[in-house]
Amino acid sequence: IKIDQGERVFIEGKNGSGKTTLIRILSGLLQSSEGAFYINDDTFRKINLKQYRSQIGNIIHSETPFEGTILDNIIFNNTDCSDEDLKWALDGVQLTPYIKSLPKGLETQIFPEGQQLSSSNAQKILLARSIINKPKVLFYEDPTDAMDEKVANEIIDFITSDINKWTIIVSSKNPYWKTKCNRFLTMEKGQIISDIKK
C-alpha cells in the first residue's frame, strides 16, 4: 500500500478484518511481524519514531482524555502551541461553547478517563489534540461516533476541508466520512481485498 500526501483514505471491513491493526501499524503504535513499511522511502525500522509521531495526529478506538486539565489534554506538553492554534483547534471541533460554559474554562480538571465529560465532549478534546500541531497525517478510529449526526458531520467537513493539507486515514461507522474521502480500502482477514481511488 502506498499512500500519497493529501489523500483521504477510508478503511472499511467487518469487525476483526484488520482495520485497527492496519491503522496502528501505519501510525507507529504497532510493529508489523512481516512485510516492510516505508515512510518517504525510508524503511520504518530506520525511522525516528519520536520525530514521526510529532508529525501525526491519532485517535484510537475507545481512547479517553487523561487526568489533568482540559488544556493539558489538548496541548499535550507542546509548549510551542500558540493561542491562535489553540483557538483554531477549539473552534474547528466545536469545543469553544463548552469551554466557555465552564467556570475554570481550559483549566478545568478532568477526572481519570474523562469520567465527568459527555462522550461527545471527550471526543472533541481528543480531536482538538490530534490537529493542534497541524500534523501531516491523521489516523482515526471512530473519532466522531459519540456525537450527534449534525455536529459530527460539521466537524468532518472541517477536518476534511481542502484548506487542511494533511493526509487522513480513517475507519468509522459514520458513513459521512466515506463521502469525504477519495480512496477506499476494504479489509478482510487481515488483507486489503479492495483498493479504489475516486
Where are these regions (language model features)?
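ABC-fold ATPase nucleotide-binding domain signature/coupling loops
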Residues: 96-125, 143, 190
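Helix-to-loop junction immediately C-terminal to a conserved catalytic motif
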Residues: 27
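The feature captures the beta-strand-to-loop junction immediately N-terminal to the Walker
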Residues: 12-14
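Conserved catalytic loops of ABC-family nucleotide-binding domains
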Residues: 158-172, 178
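Conserved "ABC signature" C-loop
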Residues: 63-109
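Catalytic Walker B motif of ABC-type/P-loop ATPase nucleotide-binding domains
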Residues: 138-142
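Conserved ABC transporter NBD signature motif
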Residues: 35-44, 52
